Design a protein with these regions (language model features):
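Conserved N-terminal beta-strand and adjoining loop/helix that marks the start
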Residues: 1-18, 39
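Conserved Nudix-box catalytic region and its N-terminal flanking loop in Nudix hydrolases
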Residues: 17-56
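Conserved hydrophobic "DFG−1" position in protein kinase catalytic cores
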Residues: 12-13, 20, 87, 104
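Generic C-terminal helix-cap and adjacent flexible tail
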Residues: 2-3, 127-130
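Active-site-adjacent beta-strand/loop module that shapes the phosphate/pyrophosphate-binding cleft
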Residues: 61-63, 71-93, 103, 107
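Hydrophobic packing within well-folded, soluble alpha/beta domains
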Residues: 50-54, 67, 102
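NUDIX/MutT-family hydrolases
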Residues: 86, 95-126
Length: 130
């Protein structure tokens, strides 16, 4: 049986734009786009994990809003259960520490990127809300 990996993703809004993060060349799913986030640690809630991951990866703090969706996707390395939330930055803009690049895109343009498969359902939900 494949390993289940619980992860969170932040759909970070700034006015009418959404933060998109491109995975590094040496990460799994190299150069694909994703909503930033990461693995949920033992005894950690989804929201706690989201705040911690964004603080560690992007050196900024989040205001976490409504949950968008939970999706599962089976990769060769395991089954990723991704829980995405609408978020806003508290103050500081994100700093790249792990990702190759970031972009702020209009919601209508989100589908122009090559997204990691687990993120695609959340992308579609956000685009359909506009």
């Amino acid at each position: 049986m494949k390993k289940q990996i619980e992860v969170v993703g932040a759909i970070i809004f700034n006015d009418d734009k959404v933060l998109c993060a491109q995975r590094n060349e040496n990460m799994s799913l190299p150069l694909m786009w994703e909503f930033p986030g990461g693995k949920i640690e033992k005894d950690e809630s989804e929201i706690e994990a989201l705040k911690r991951e964004i603080s560690e990866e992007m050196l900024c703090d989040l205001e976490v809003g409504d949950k968008v969706t939970s999706t599962s996707y089976e990769y060769h390395f395991g089954i990723v259960n991704l829980h995405t939330y609408k978020c806003k930055l508290k103050e500081k803009m994100p700093t790249l520490t792990e990702h190759k690049s970031i972009q702020w895109l209009d919601v209508k343009d989100l589908e122009t990127l090559e997204w990691a498969p687990a993120d695609i359902p959340a992308v579609k939900i956000i685009v359909d809300e506009v």
